[in-house]
Design a protein with these regions (language model features):
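Hydrophobic transmembrane alpha-helices
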Residues: 1-56
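Small-polar-interrupted transmembrane alpha-helices in polytopic inner-membrane proteins
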Residues: 19, 23, 61-66
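Membrane-embedded alpha-helical hairpins and interfacial helices in multi-pass inner-membrane proteins
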Residues: 27-35, 43, 63-160
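Interfacial helix-start motif at the membrane-water boundary
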Residues: 47-54, 58-62, 71, 75
């Protein structure tokens, strides 16, 4: 049992570190925040299909990334909540991989626009931000996440 706990903790920590690293990489190119967001780290949101440790790993990774990027507290709280909800939904839909991509896309598309509008006061409307955030999520989570899923699924017996 102790080995499984250590393995679970290690997997979660590695996923959190990857999430932070990919978010910081996106920040270097100005893709991680603002009206149009393309967080490369969101591709990792498919990982709960393979690993239960991905749920806390993604959540902690998002929390740390938001703190390290200097986001305001409401973004840290609600952005992390959106990631947690998406990760839990993905885990629950792990036997339906195409549907498993939807929870993180939907949670971020619904929650993040309110943060952009009311916490940051960015010019634009909630529906506009739903469109822009949703598009970014479709690319990062839907497209890149699907590519990651296809790659990992071929080798899941060796990896997991």
């Amino acid at each position: 049992m102790k080995h499984n706990n250590t393995k679970h903790l290690t997997q979660g920590a590695v996923i959190a570190a990857l999430y932070v690293a990919l978010t910081l990489l996106a920040k270097v190119f100005g893709l991680d925040s603002g009206q149009i967001q393309l967080r490369l780290s969101e591709a990792l949101c498919i990982l709960p299909v393979f690993l239960p440790a991905a749920v806390p790993g993604l959540t902690v990774g998002c929390l740390l990334a938001n703190l390290l990027c200097g986001n305001i507290i409401w973004d840290v709280v609600f952005g992390t909540l959106a990631t947690l909800l998406g990760a839990v939904g993905t885990r629950l839909l792990r036997n339906r991989p195409l549907l498993a991509l939807l929870p993180p896309i939907l949670s971020n598309t619904v929650i993040v626009p309110f943060v952009l509008t009311y916490a940051y006061g960015l010019p634009g409307t909630v529906p506009f931000f739903m469109l822009t955030v949703g598009l970014g999520e479709l690319i990062s989570c839907g497209l890149l996440g699907r590519l990651l899923y296809n790659t990992l699924d071929k080798h899941k017996n060796q990896l997991f």
